[in-house]
């Protein structure tokens, strides 16, 4: 009898032990507190990979309160947006928005088209202090494996003159809902220190953009001897040569007049007094109320430039730089004050947003200005900050400035014997195009509310 009771107790103990073990096992399957029960979207994914030893990103200043971000996409499978799977004709069903501008560079060349690489083999720029410069590598990059970029383009080190490249770029711009391509421009026969003249490529860019319902504005770069007189000649040349093209961008101002819009890079290199000769009503060679009038947007770098831009007769200002905190103009926390100044003085404020910044492939000493992409989070923070100030136009730095790592163009993972390139993993190469479209649609909806 005692033996039977002992067996029953042992059996009961084993049953209880089994039940307790099962319950504990089930508890281990529960998601830990603070983690999402579902798979992460782009905002929750792990940080992007970067080569060992790459500097940790500097923490950007907190962005101001912003409108709530648009709802994330579902995880439902969808067809690839790549050109190989898409219809070869322009995707006319996708809308683009003329209030969304992207800075575009046509300075790239390859042996297949130009006989040699252009810009992909960019020099490593020495620091202005010889003592600092001595600590960093010098020389020129050696494509195709070694590019003057921290990312590797999906198209490889391409030529901007390749018609297939132009079509693919317009496809990507359209996927991103970008309605205006802002073309980096030098006068005929001129180029930057690492490039070759590209004005003869403008007709092909205009023609291709027109097929995709994209418009083209001009980003006038600094060149030797640039002043108010030469810019007058530049404006006349651009309007006379390209102004009648269907893809030439014109902005409708508050008076209902459609005028060409020009971005003037490094405008602060010319004095406000000289600009006033060109941009004010009574200037000695004023273009106001002439066939060459336009909307002229100056670059804002330092806080004092706001008053210089106003005195010079410009119509507005943009910030260009994608490194939050790099300058007064590029710091998100200053945009509200800048917008208030512009509103008070009847100027347009065009904030520039970027997906990140890293130019150490060409300026190896400049790692303190690196801004990590954080899988799109940095980009979305900038877009939030821009929408908070209710701008008329948002500009994107950039579509394809690969040297400074600000591109939203598709990039792919790449490892060579001497280089480990950054990439967009764990996301697809189209991540920044998709984020741009999502925020563009949100921007347009917000604008409709602002105008009510």
UniProtKB/Swiss-Prot annotation:
Bias kind Pro residues: ranges: 64-74
Membrane topology term: Single-pass type II membrane protein
Entry-linked InterPro entries: Glyco_Hydrolase_99 (IPR026071)
Keyword Membrane listed: yes
Main location: Golgi
UniProt-annotated stretches for the region Disordered: 40-90
Pfam family for this entry, one: Glyco_hydro_99
Transmembrane segments: 9-29
CDD domains recorded: GH99
Residue ranges, Lumenal side: 30-452
Cellular component annotations (GO), alphabetically ordered: Golgi membrane
Keywords, sorted A to Z: Golgi apparatus, Hydrolase, Membrane, Signal-anchor, Transmembrane, Transmembrane helix
EC nos: 3.2.1.-
PANTHER family xref list: ENDO-ALPHA-1,2-MANNOSIDASE, GLYCOPROTEIN ENDO-ALPHA-1,2-MANNOSIDASE-LIKE PROTEIN
Record-stated family: Belongs to the glycosyl hydrolase 99 family.
Protein name listed in UniProt: Glycoprotein endo-alpha-1,2-mannosidase-like protein
Originating gene: Maneal
